[in-house]
Curated annotation (Swiss-Prot):
KO phenotype (gene knockout): No visible phenotype under normal growth condition, but increased sensitivity to elevated levels of nitrite.
One GO cellular component, as annotated: chloroplast
Gene name of this polypeptide: GLB1
Keyword annotations from UniProtKB, A to Z: ATP-binding, Chloroplast, Magnesium, Metal-binding, Nucleotide-binding, Plastid, Transcription, Transcription regulation, Transit peptide
Localization in the cell: Plastid, Chloroplast
Highest rank taxon of the organism: Eukaryota
Positions annotated to bind Mg(2+): 110
Name this protein carries in UniProt: Nitrogen regulatory protein P-II homolog
SUBUNIT field: Homodimer. Interacts with NAGK. Interaction with NAGK is dependent of MgATP and inhibited by 2-oxoglutarate, arginine, glutamate, citrate, and oxaloacetate.
Similarity-based family: Belongs to the P(II) protein family.
Stretch forming the transit peptide: 1-61
Molecular function (Gene Ontology), one example: ATP binding
Chief location category: plastid
Length: 196
């Protein structure tokens, strides 16, 4: 009975949902033209004045919606960035007091697409994956936004392929050496030479 009550839905190539088989392009234009004066709510864009020979790039700040992120004491911030930006990001994280970072070499592709390598004059593009670096940082809830903004500031070039940041809730943190859990295990104490 439930199957007979549902309406067929088609997804068009433009991503609109409709109970019609086809959507005319003019329908899409009229929908989109209604949004021409709106401002994206997900980004704060402010232009940054150029320093030296650098280009003018807008300052991008990720905004968080309390409904969007599940409530948790700890969060893991995973950032996939360009390998040659890792030093800038790591230094910036140290300046804001973040000392516990795990870094892994990864490969993948997104909007940037894959790359083609040249060896001996021949082109090879077996898997089209691009080398990136994944940074994993577990922080308390009140540190998430500053970590995200620091990563964006350090990793951003303004070009396709700058990377992605993922934020995941973490249910618990356990320090292997002592068995401590929660905030005691997450907290990094002492100087860089003394273990915590």
């Amino acid at each position: 009975m439930a199957a007979s009550m549902t309406k067929p839905i088609s997804i068009t190539s433009l991503g609109f949902y409709s109970d019609r088989k086809n959507i005319a392009f003019s329908d899409c234009i009229s929908i989109c033209s209604g949004f021409r004066h709106s401002r994206p709510s997900c980004l704060d864009l402010v232009t940054k004045s150029p320093s030296n020979n650098s280009r003018v790039l807008p300052v991008v700040s990720a905004q968080i919606s309390s409904d969007y992120i599940p409530d948790s004491k700890f969060y893991k911030v995973e950032a996939i960035v360009r390998p040659w930006r890792i030093q800038q990001v790591s230094s910036a994280l140290l300046k804001i007091g973040i000392r516990g970072v795990t870094v892994s070499d990864v490969r993948g592709f997104g909007a940037q697409g894959g790359s083609t390598e040249r060896h001996g004059g021949s082109e090879f593009s077996e898997d089209k994956f691009v080398a990136k670096v994944k940074m994993e940082i577990v922080v308390k809830k009140d540190q998430v936004e500053s970590v995200i903004n620091t990563i964006i500031e350090g990793a951003r070039t303004g070009e396709i392929g700058d990377g992605k940041i993922f934020v995941l809730p973490v249910s618990d943190v356990i320090r292997v050496r002592t068995g401590e859990r929660g905030e005691k295990a997450e907290k990094m104490t002492g100087d860089m030479l003394s273990p915590s």
